[in-house]
Amino acid sequence: MMRSTILAFLVTASAALAGCVVATAPARPAEQHAMRNGFVYLGERFVNGSADHDVLPVGRADGKFHELMVVVERAPVEIFDMVVTFGNGERFEPRTRLVFGRDSTSRNIDLPGGARVIRRVDFRYGNLVAGAQAKVELWGR
């Protein structure tokens, strides 16, 4: 009796674990471009309307960076402003009023002063297609 109970438990547990297998999605072309060029992923935000503002915290644990790249996925978006706040509180506002197509990247954005800790990046942007939700990713190297 005990043996059949254990066997039933093992079969049930195996079936449950088999359902927990997670498949990862392959990187999109824009992400592949960033990774091929030595950039590391810093975070992402979703654009939730025609006008949106988001803060992407980065922090000392992520390292020091001398360049940034913006990757846009899923839908076109317009970035009105981007403000980089460094670890020492200094701010940098690269010229970024750009329209991004779906699955595209920005140019490499050189940061002033060499490799630096980034505290946060503020984005002000808007979707270009009603009802679409663009994903904006930040990459650094």
Region spans (language model):
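Exposed aromatic-hydrophobic patches
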Residues: 54-59, 105-112
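Noncatalytic modules at the cell exterior or secretory-pathway interfaces
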Residues: 63-70, 112-130
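Solvent-exposed serine/threonine-rich low-complexity stretches and specific carbohydrate-binding patches
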Residues: 43-45, 94-101
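Bacterial N-terminal signal peptides that target proteins for export
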Residues: 1-13
